[in-house]
Swiss-Prot record:
GO cellular component, as recorded: cytosol; oxoglutarate dehydrogenase complex
Protein name as it appears in the record: Dihydrolipoyllysine-residue succinyltransferase component of 2-oxoglutarate dehydrogenase complex
Residue(s) carrying N6-lipoyllysine: 43
InterPro entries xref list: 2-oxoA_DH_lipoyl-BS, 2-oxoacid_dehydrogenase, 2-oxoacid_DH_actylTfrase, Biotin_lipoyl, CAT-like_dom_sf, E3-bd_dom_sf, PSBD, Single_hybrid_motif
Enzyme active site: 369, 373
Record text on subunit structure and interactions: Forms a 24-polypeptide structural core with octahedral symmetry. Part of the 2-oxoglutarate dehydrogenase (OGDH) complex composed of E1 (2-oxoglutarate dehydrogenase), E2 (dihydrolipoamide succinyltransferase) and E3 (dihydrolipoamide dehydrogenase); the complex contains multiple copies of the three enzymatic components (E1, E2 and E3).
A single GO BP: L-lysine catabolic process to acetyl-CoA via saccharopine
CDD domains: lipoyl_domain
Cofactor note: Binds 1 lipoyl cofactor covalently.
Residue ranges annotated for the Peripheral subunit-binding (PSBD) domain, each copy included: 112-149
Organism of origin: Rickettsia typhi (strain ATCC VR-144 / Wilmington)
Domain of life: Bacteria
Xref: PROSITE patterns: BIOTINYL_LIPOYL (PS50968), LIPOYL (PS00189), PSBD (PS51826)
Necessary cofactors: (R)-lipoate
Amino acid sequence: MSIKIIIPSLGESVTEATIAKWYKKLGDAVKTDELLLEIETDKVTLEVNAPCNGTIGKISKTDGANVTVGEEVGEINEIADTDTAWINNKKQEVSQHTSEQLVDKPAMASNILAPSVQKLVTENKLDPNNIKGTGRGGRITKYDVLETINTTPITIETHAINKTNEERTQRVRMSRLRKTIAQRLKDSQNTAAILTTFNEIDMSKVIALRNQYKEEFEKKHTVKLGFMSFFVKATIEALKLIPSINAEIDGDDLLYKNYYDIGVAVGTEQGLVVPVIRDADKMSFADIEQAIGNLAKKAREGKLSISDLSGGTFSISNGGVYGSLLSTPIINPPQSGILGLHKTEERAVVIDGKIEIRPMMYIALSYDHRIIDGKEGVSFLVKIKNLIENPEKLLLNL
């Protein structure tokens, strides 16, 4: 009996993927849940495992092919559980044969790369034998290649001043992630009536509070106290005050969400991703800092799962970590708002009729004007400003 190998669900709003690499070939024996192939979406790399014991009877989509959810990419000739001894013997024969072939070719295994990984290696003129693989079975992943690139000294070559037009430009095909980012951002602008409102925050008190307790906080919770946990907490309180910003348009209806899954934008070598902190309103400051740290690490290593990226009721983007003074963030559909944070900079401000130097931050709220009125957008930022400038209110739930 033949069992189809089907592309599984890829998560919310993701319907297409690319086959990165098949790890089995026609006739290979496989066991239930054994790795068959890897597929790449615009967000993550996923493994497709064997649905049953048997042998590979058909491969209809090869490496590099584009596939969709539910599409058949091959078949397994099923073997009953009582025949697993035959599979084990078959695997042992293949393993022995492979070992004999590799006796005089120890570097061959490291050169078996997924197309996307091979492309990175080739473009950067790297030797795969010099890259330490951290993937399953020691295979080389995109993250391994990027780490090698980042740690390799740059050699600057001297060229003649006169160059041909071809040498002065370089054409590079957009990655699936970059194409998806471009499409989603353009769709957001074309669909939503985006409006941005601004405010500024005196960061003096929250900085003082953090400096006073950061060492004690880290010692107790084994995670550093940053400013993001304060902003996540303040954002949730502002969303409770203005429920429409935590809602979305669904056809002719407004869908109000009584939960708070906050997306936090993270920049990676591949592009921007927005992993989600689930039920952030139920978390402590330490829980939020831990969640942000874990998600950021997974994002940089390319190990985010579909569930890490799916959903989200509102997003926060902190351009301040890159030195941004002011920006107008773009909404992440189908959400209705996004908060933009920026760098803290000492500026002269008037306090009680006197000019003082204070650490100030500009904040921005981009929102969908179809569902959110201007008054609500302004009130949202004022609430956040009030809580950050008086952080004791966050601690006392005021």
